[in-house]
Regions:
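N-terminal acidic, proline/glycine-rich, low-complexity intrinsically disordered segments
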Residues: 1-9, 15
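A short, Lys/Arg-rich alpha-helix, primarily the initiator
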Residues: 11-72, 122-156, 200, 204
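Short alpha-helical DNA-recognition segment
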Residues: 56-88, 153-175
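Residue-level detection of the helix-turn-helix DNA-binding "recognition helix"
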Residues: 67, 92, 178-180, 207
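Short, basic-rich loop-to-helix N-cap that marks the start of a DNA-contacting helix
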Residues: 81-86, 92-106, 180-193
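Short C-terminal boundary/hinge segments that cap the last helix of small helical domains
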Residues: 98-102, 106-126, 196-208
Length: 208
């Protein structure tokens, strides 16, 4: 799958807009940067709320339906279910973890890319993997880190330089190497856009 989003070109030397320069790249070349769009958690909340109203559910009912998508896995693991407040909290603070976002997207039948601000409409190129009741969709964070680090080295970027491009801190990026559970969905989506790959390349049906 190669669902690549639009890009922008930065010429050097003599670029007028210094904010669009890529740090730590040789000055005698043209660098093409992907157009990196933020993940709109507010729009995700609105989509959840619209479907909730359509089905006549309370937020507790939505959380229950989301959790029951992995009913067989839940019976085996006895994990703590997703809380309704995890869903409703996005109304006031429009952000969510990358793993929780997958639970919500699975229930909606939507792709992560369909919630990029000003991004593409939902498209089969970006479809998430199928998962049965014995699986839960999860981000493969180690694979995401390895792919990011490989491209960073190829592009000759330091961690601070890449962090500047992705509008985050270097530790947020390097921390993915040992992350046990999740990072923010916005950061995960910024990384996959920079890689020029669909989020689905880094999502798998997990047994946890």
């Amino acid at each position: 799958m190669t669902g690549v989003l639009p890009s922008q070109t930065v010429s050097r030397p003599g670029c007028v807009d210094q904010m669009r320069r890529t740090p730590d790249v040789r000055h005698d070349q043209t660098v093409t940067l992907p157009q990196i769009r933020p993940f709109d958690a507010g729009a995700l909340y609105q989509a959840l709320d619209a479907r909730r109203a359509e089905l006549g559910l309370s937020w507790s009912g939505v959380a229950s339906q989301i959790w029951q998508l992995s009913a067989d896995l839940n019976d085996r693991r006895r994990d703590h279910p997703i809380s309704p407040s995890t869903l409703t909290g996005m109304a006031d603070k429009p952000r969510t973890s990358c793993q929780h976002a997958l639970f919500m997207l699975r229930w909606l039948g939507r792709s992560p890319e369909s919630f990029l601000a000003g991004g593409p409409e939902d498209d089969a190129r970006f479809a998430l993997p199928a998962a049965g009741p014995d699986r839960r969709l999860r981000w493969a964070l180690k694979l995401l880190y390895a792919s990011m680090d490989e491209k960073r080295r190829q592009d000759g970027l330091t961690w601070p330089a890449l962090a500047a491009l992705l509008e985050c801190s270097p530790s947020q990026l390097t921390g993915l190497r040992t992350a046990k559970f999740a990072t923010g969905m916005d950061l995960a989506m910024r990384i996959v856009q920079w890689l020029g790959r669909p989020a689905a390349d880094f999502v798998y049906p997990a047994r946890w």
